[in-house]
Amino acid sequence: MRRCLLILPLALVLVACKSGPTDAELDRLLAEARAANAAAGTAHTRPDGDAAQTGRVLEVSGQVSRPARLDWAAVSRLAQSHVRTVSTQTTNLRHVIDFRGLLVRDLLATHGPAPDVSEVTFVSLDGFRSTVDIEGLRRFDVLLAIEADGKALSRAEGGPIFLVFPHTSAPETVERYNDRYWAYYVSHVVVGTERIALRIGDRILDTAAFAMLPQVSRSQTVGWKVHWPSTPVAVHGVTLPDLLQSAGVGLPPDGRVIVRGKAATHRDPATPRSIPVADLARCPYLVVSHHGSAREPIPARLGGPLALAVPPACDGPDAEPLWIPFVDELVVEATR
């Protein structure tokens, strides 16, 4: 989705260098961007998809006293607040839209963030994430919107759930929370950072169990993009074979390891993120939990607590999608 959204500003800049876009050109560019976004979301709107795959579930997790999984009925019932603001995701930047949804500060008050939490990460169906300081979320009318001008948000408009900032009523948020903070297809609200809970077969590895396994370190550029530096960084974690062995899971020679993350695009059964077992000897994939020379835990803003790192020798056009943040499950399947 975010690649699609980047196309529109670039096109606008290129046109503006000549003479400025006409209204017709703006409408055409917006239509193209919306069509691309709709195509990107098609995999998650199949009739046989469950609610989590289609974004009609909102999960609240992390450092909260009351984690929850809200179904669409609950989301709709709680979405009683309105924010009237212009949107960064439309060509008519002067049109004030009446968004209806759930104020994030009310959501936080309900689920009880830990006192030391400083930020909240919103995860989208397509893997995009937006991390916002908790002080701003409590101060401003930041909304998880489900309607715009009385109509349910379509996929092309960022629905079912769209993270919206009050640019009109709180002008200071225009610079503080520019368009990169607005998030389409929100499915998870991660308060602070979750504890490690990696499911492998019928076992769940917690932080202590993960730390007891052989740790591997290496320096490399990372493929999660958001908030990570473009230069090499040290990452520390456990190889896939060691993780699977610790859980007593065998590796059939002709099998594959499916790596599942939090986002729907990383859990879609139609397009599993998988690694052939035969590749594990050649490519030491790491599930990483720490980064940097100080071995700091990977926070949610960087895709933690666990993320899959692709070895430099195996990183390429085909391997790039296997950079998976928020890893929470490993599954081994025999090839059919």
Regions found by a protein language model. Give the residues of each.
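C-terminal motif of bacterial Sec signal peptides marking the signal peptidase cleavage site
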Residues: V13-A16
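N-terminal intrinsically disordered, low-complexity segments enriched in P/E/S/T
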Residues: K18-R336
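Bacterial N-terminal signal peptides that target proteins for export
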Residues: M1-L6
